[in-house]
């Protein structure tokens, strides 16, 4: 099961998750609109605790996924982060430099080098801190990654 966490301006039926669904991948995408980070993490933790999953998160949703993966690594089979907002010092991520990736499952990050919303340095710092086998794919696109749908689906 793929659990999709959309970003602040996204929705459970946004363009990226719709493209993934249309490719034939089964996706569960909760509605996180108007929710703080803690609320998103609570919902994801509950879903993840029920079965092994693959997590995918975009921007703010990527931050929530990274946090849940750190809390429940044994339940995660893989994770895809899209322009993740890993640098935001927001509760419970008051110290972003302490957020590290688990090393027991594959993780891919797709981030645009020209992202004007979340700097690519957020992803690069996460990769460097984590000291494990993360795959950072740098693309030329916007924060929304609208030109990278085929890459998102393949990852």
Give a label for each model feature:
Residues 54-56, 79:
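Conserved alpha/beta-hydrolase fold motif
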